[in-house]
UniProtKB/Swiss-Prot annotation:
Name recorded for this polypeptide: NADH-ubiquinone oxidoreductase chain 4
Family: Belongs to the complex I subunit 4 family.
Superkingdom to which the source organism belongs: Eukaryota
Pfam families registered for this protein in UniProt: Oxidored_q5_N, Proton_antipo_M
Database matches in InterPro entries: NADH4_N, NADH_Q_OxRdtase_chainM/4, NADH_UbQ_OxRdtase, ND/Mrp_TM
Signal sequence segment: none
UniProt keyword terms in alphabetical order: Electron transport, Membrane, Mitochondrion, NAD, Respiratory chain, Translocase, Transmembrane, Transmembrane helix, Transport, Ubiquinone
GO CC annotation terms, alphabetical: mitochondrial membrane
Origin species: Gadus morhua (Atlantic cod)
Membrane topology, record value: Multi-pass membrane protein
Cystine residue pairs: none
Catalysed reactions, as listed in the record: a ubiquinone + NADH + 5 H(+)(in) = a ubiquinol + NAD(+) + 4 H(+)(out)
Job description of the protein: Core subunit of the mitochondrial membrane respiratory chain NADH dehydrogenase (Complex I) that is believed to belong to the minimal assembly required for catalysis. Complex I functions in the transfer of electrons from NADH to the respiratory chain. The immediate electron acceptor for the enzyme is believed to be ubiquinone.
Gene Ontology terms for molecular function: NADH dehydrogenase (ubiquinone) activity; ubiquinone binding
Lineage of origin: Eukaryota, Metazoa, Chordata, Craniata, Vertebrata
Length: 460
């Protein structure tokens, strides 16, 4: 654990002490070394599952894949942001890298926390760097509005969680994840325990986001700079799913009745947000709504609480993190060339940038869950566990899968095929940096096919 935490901490002085000429190469090299070092985590699962640094920080098979994903994403964010920050003053570039490094630090501490309150504090702390990145480096004036939505949705959702955790602490005397699965269930007034259950879940359902609490997400995604979109889609949404999995153990026997409305909402959301995607003209907005749709499946899988549901949810979270982050990078490469996110104004790019079309194709196929990609493994496991619970869910999930395929292909065809508009005849070529960025997103996704057991979490 320390071999990752200490270099991440030292990224901050590195950023401020390096000469301006070497700023990006050094930050990138150090973060890439951290990312490569974090892969060793996948190797050392102990018999109990927990590998603890001290009584507050440790890893287990559930948090390890998410930790590796968080570390893997920092160098990719730096690679993606290099171009659009090159015109900014040096101190602002340093500030930007500092914010991304602190965000990674908070994420490592959130996923590594074995104490519920520490997880809560880090869960909230990730808000600050993200908010600053969105409101300071976003592309349009609506970014302030988006930042406000992001802040207030998340804070309003997570205040009840704090109260619920304090009540749990009062009743059981501990909030350690190592002990709390063995504690007695919390018994409150007949209705009080139901409110307590909802308070525990709402914060994570807003973060995921569940359909109905998702309004902050498209706004935040569309207005954020590329690194903001990447980390939001790839890791911050996964904090919600991770928190739900951690708390689900404590919430039995209440969950049996309480999960029904949320599963219905999640599956309904898969269909509705998919349909919204079919009507989008804005590229980033389409990818953002597709995130809501995928996370709806994840929420359904977790709320079913079967081994298959949990495993499928974890696989889909990791796979979706890589695929949607790749799509945001591609949308950004388009935006940097055409200065427009509208799909009608930037089509026919296959003629101008043929190699980028290959990346678009692979990322779109990953998004629509083509076999044998891990996206399909996750979706199949979730569909099976939902079908096992009630056969009727197959109708909803089937329609959802169909719509996902439809909007993924629609996005690919709209942006890549067709005639090249007149105003786009002289585009700059694609850079090696962008190809490296896409390769580092999609190669891990393809390698997971060979050993999916790394992502099976508790049930490997």
């Amino acid at each position: 654990m320390l071999k990752i935490l200490i270099p991440t901490l030292f990224l901050l002085p590195t950023t401020w002490l390096t000469s301006s000429k070497w700023l990006w190469p050094t930050a990138l090299t150090q973060s890439m070394l951290i990312a490569l070092g974090s892969i060793t985590w996948l190797n050392n699962t102990t018999d109990t599952g927990w590998t603890a640094l001290n009584s507050y920080i440790g890893t287990d098979p559930l948090s390890t894949p998410l930790l590796v994903l968080s570390c893997w994403l920092l160098p990719l964010m730096l690679l993606a942001s290099q171009n659009h920050l090159s015109s900014e003053p040096m101190n602002r570039q340093r500030m930007y890298i500092t914010l991304l490094a602190t965000l990674q630090l908070f994420l490592i501490l959130a996923f590594g926390a074995t104490e519920m309150i520490m997880f809560y504090v880090m869960f909230e702390a990730t808000l600050i760097p993200t908010l600053l990145v969105i409101t300071r480096w976003g592309n349009h004036t609506e970014r302030l509005n988006a930042g406000t939505y992001f802040l207030f949705y998340t804070l309003a959702g997570s205040l009840p969680l704090l109260v619920a955790l304090l009540m749990l602490q009062n009743n059981t005397g501990t909030l350690s994840l190592l002990i709390i699965p063995y504690a007695k269930p919390l018994l409150l007034m007949p209705f009080g325990s139901k409110i307590w259950w909802a308070a525990c879940m709402i914060a994570f359902l807003v973060k995921m986001p569940l359909y109905g609490m998702h309004l902050w997400l498209p706004k935040a995604h569309v207005e954020a700079p590329v690194a903001g979109s990447m980390v939001l889609a790839a890791v911050l949404l996964k904090l919600g799913g991770y928190g739900m999995m951690r708390l689900m153990i404590v919430l039995d026997p209440l969950s049996k009745e309480m999960v029904y409305p949320f599963i219905v909402l999640a599956l309904w959301g898969v269909i509705i947000t998919g349909s919204i995607c079919l009507r989008q003209t804005d590229l980033k907005s389409l990818i953002a709504y597709s995130s809501v749709s995928h996370m709806g499946l994840v929420a359904g899988g977790i709320l079913i609480q079967t081994p298959w549901g949990f495993t499928g949810a974890l696989i889909l979270m990791i796979a979706h993190g890589l695929a949607s982050s790749a799509l945001f990078c591609l949308a950004n490469t388009n935006y940097e060339r055409t200065h427009s996110r509208t799909m009608l104004l930037a089509r026919g790019l296959q003629i101008a940038l043929p190699l980028m079309t290959t990346w678009w194709f692979i990322a779109s196929l990953a998004n629509l869950a083509l076999p044998p990609l891990p996206n399909l493994m996750g979706e199949l496991m979730i569909l099976t566990s939902l079908f096992n619970w009630s056969a009727w869910t197959l109708i909803l999930t089937g329609i959802g899968t169909l719509i996902t395929a439809a909007y993924s292909l629609y996005m690919f065809l709209m942006s890549q095929r067709g005639p090249l508009p007149q105003h786009m005849l002289a585009l700059p070529p694609s850079y090696t940096r962008e190809h490296l960025l896409m390769a580092l997103h999609l190669i891990p996704l393809l390698l997971i096919i060979l050993k999916p057991a790394l992502l099976w979490g508790w049930f490997a």
